């Protein structure tokens, strides 16, 4: 087929591929090295203490958040994706984990506010800790990886587009 010839011209050579994946690995090493271990410990303590966990995110960060929710369920936690129709209401003892790379997504701010009114605790995982959303939470985990529309100068730059580094680092 004609499209096969087009595909052959766009194939990345092996050396270029190796250079790219080594660069991506170095980016992740830099993010891990820059993370505040006390924030990680605080986030883990919130997760361990929660009776039930609710997870929210939007766009590609939301896809990563759903994967994170599934992994928490595999660890034995009762976990709900906040957008599901069958999600129960939150109450004291519950935890809402909001993934918000840019730190300023209005509907996530609204949901954090509502969760706080129920007595649930709130954890925000973000690449922009000085923005509005992280300030709404009891605990904030700064992932210093480049995010889409991020402004924090401490984030690790990436050769990858948009917020790929942040989204990958969520795993």
Where do the PLM segments sit?
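Extended alpha-helical regions
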Residues: 1-7, 164-171
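Short amphipathic alpha-helical segments, especially helix-boundary/capping motifs
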Residues: 3-5, 17-21, 43-46, 86-88, ...
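Generic N-terminal amphipathic, Lys/Arg-enriched alpha-helix
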Residues: 3-33
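Glycine-rich phosphate-binding loops that contact phosphosugars or nucleotide phosphates
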Residues: 54-58, 64-169
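A short alpha-helix capping/helix-coil boundary motif
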Residues: 21-23, 45-50, 89-92, 109-110
């Amino acid at each position: 087929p004609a499209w096969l010839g087009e595909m052959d011209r766009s194939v990345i050579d092996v050396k270029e591929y190796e250079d790219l994946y080594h660069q991506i690995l170095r980016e992740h090493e830099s993010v891990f090295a820059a993370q505040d271990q006390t924030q990680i410990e605080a986030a883990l303590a919130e997760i361990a203490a929660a009776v039930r966990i609710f997870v929210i995110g939007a766009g590609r960060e939301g896809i990563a958040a759903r994967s994170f929710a599934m992994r928490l369920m595999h660890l034995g936690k009762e976990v709900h994706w906040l957008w599901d129709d069958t999600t129960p209401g939150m109450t004291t003892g519950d935890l809402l984990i909001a993934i918000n790379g840019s730190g300023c997504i209005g509907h996530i701010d609204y949901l954090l506010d509502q969760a706080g009114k129920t007595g649930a605790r709130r954890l925000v995982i973000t690449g922009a800790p000085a923005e509005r959303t992280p300030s709404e939470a009891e605990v904030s985990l700064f992932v210093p990886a480049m995010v889409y529309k991020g402004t924090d100068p401490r984030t690790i730059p990436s050769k990858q587009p948009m917020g790929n580094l942040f989204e990958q680092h969520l795993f």
